[in-house]
Structure formats: structure tokens, C-alpha cells
């Protein structure tokens, strides 16, 4: 009887001792999961155009890299830039032209671009009537709801007009007074406008309502353009190189997913990001962007792309002087991630 008691006691001790490392390991693991580093990302708009970013969020790639990402939509590059400069955002996602403007104004802590997501414009020209044989010269004498002066949507639009022999100031009327994201509503409520320049899902929504028809893709007609990129203040990048690398790694995983999956698969992953849009519409939009080669295979912001951007700014009269590529672009994190 005593032997049985001793054996039971010994077994209990062995179990307790064996369990200690496992308990400690579990606590360490739990503790590790709780120690995700918080990062705030301010995006210029919430659009299917940025699908690789939402894939990275929905697939948990940021968490895998140890980051707790908070996503805020700024509704305009000017607002994203303000959030970056004020410190409300750690990382911004917008057109790189905003960083050039800030640099031109003598920013003491320059906003530097470190990853390029899109390589084409993501907006479309929507007409009030069906125009299967549309040509850019059809805009002569017509009214178009455009974008903010100095913003990428408007500058790329004007870049295309000039490529097709049109003078944006003389050959047509461009309304630049409407806030970003409000042009589709303005188009349905203002019969005086013949065309509007829209991102998705607004372009497809207008088509579904029978209120407009996509007649041209600015992304196709402008050619490859460094449309949107990720940026951060120089001081933040210098203090947090690990965070910058982890963030870029997560994005690259999203890029890899998009390159290796179908539009249908991509749409299913990002569907939770767009609760007001049905899956069929999301799929159609993803396919539209997919087919026109919207997303890069890597995040490296090449010098040639930066110089093309400056050409567009110069052509639009928005560039005081050309900025050295090395001053506003850092490719270290993107190269490491690719």
C-alpha cells in the first residue's frame, strides 16, 4: 500500500516537473503574441486598386511579421501627408508627388518613399452615354469632372490629354472643385457634366446604375507610371529600421499572393475589406486591374519611374526644380523583401 502511495506521489511529481517547461513555453508564446508592435498606416483611399495591401492584411502577413497594423483612410494625398508630418501616422500610402511637394517647401524631416505598389493609374474615364468607339479627341468642347489640381489623378489625366494633342485648358472644361471621392455622386446629380474620372468601385457602380459607361482606362493610356507608394518620415525610418523591414516584408507577401493567384481568389480574400460591395463586383474590378498589369511583382521604386513622375509634374507646371532620386527614395527595404 505504501509502495502504491509512493508511486502515485512520484508520478505526480514527474508530471508536475514535466509540465513546468511546457507552461513556461506557453506563457512565453502568449507573451510573444501580445507584444506585436503597433503601426499606423494612413492610406490615400480605400480602393480595390490596392488589392495586394488588403491581401496582406486579410492573410495575416503583418501579424506574421510581428506588427499590429491600424489602417486609416485619409481621403487625399494632402491629408495623408499632413498625418505623416504631424506624427498621427507612422507610414503613408499615397502618390509620391506629395513627398516631392513637401521637399520643395523645405521640409526639415523629408518624407521618403520606400515601396511602390502600383505601376499604372487606377482610374477610368466614365461617359454619360455608351461610346464603343471612343477617342480622346471626343473630349473637345465637353465638360469633365476631374481631380484636385496637383494630384496624381488630375496630372495623369492631363498627361494623357496632351499625349493625344489636347490642351487641358482650352479644348475642354475640367471641374477640379469637387472633393476626392465625391465625383461619382456629383456626376449623377449634375447633368451638365459629360464625363467623370473615377476610381473603382465608383466606375463600376455608375455602370451598374446605368448612370455611366467606362470608355477608357487611364492606366492603359498613360503607360507605366509610379502611381502610389509607401512613405515615412526620415526620422521614423532611421529610428525604426526593423519595423520598416517587417512592414515591407508583409507587403511583398501580399504582392506575391496577387502574382500567383486568380482574380477570383484575390477577390475572395479581400472581400471583408469591402462589405458594401458584392463579391461578383469585387471580382470584376480585380480582373480589370489584373488584366492591365496594375501591380508590380516587387516593391522597388526604380530611378526611371521617379524621373517619369517628375516629367509628369514638370509637364503639369507643379515642379519648381527636379529633386535627386536618392533624396526621396530608399530601396533598401524593398530589395531585402524581394
Regions found by a protein language model. Give the residues of each.
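Short, glycine-/small- and polar/acidic-enriched structural segments
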Residues: 29-177, 186, 194-200, 211, ...
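Short amphipathic alpha-helical segments at helix boundaries and their inter-helical linkers
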Residues: 89-93, 290-303, 333-338
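Soluble non-cytosolic domains of exported or imported proteins
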Residues: 47, 74-78, 93, 151-152, ...
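C-terminal solvent-exposed extensions
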Residues: 308-338
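Predominant activation on well-ordered alpha-helical scaffold segments within soluble catalytic domains
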Residues: 54, 100, 158, 204, ...
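Pocket-lining segment of extracytoplasmic ligand-binding domains
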Residues: 129, 181-274
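Short, low-complexity disordered leader/linker segments with a strong preference
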Residues: 1-38, 335-338
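Secondary-structure end/capping motifs
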Residues: 238-320
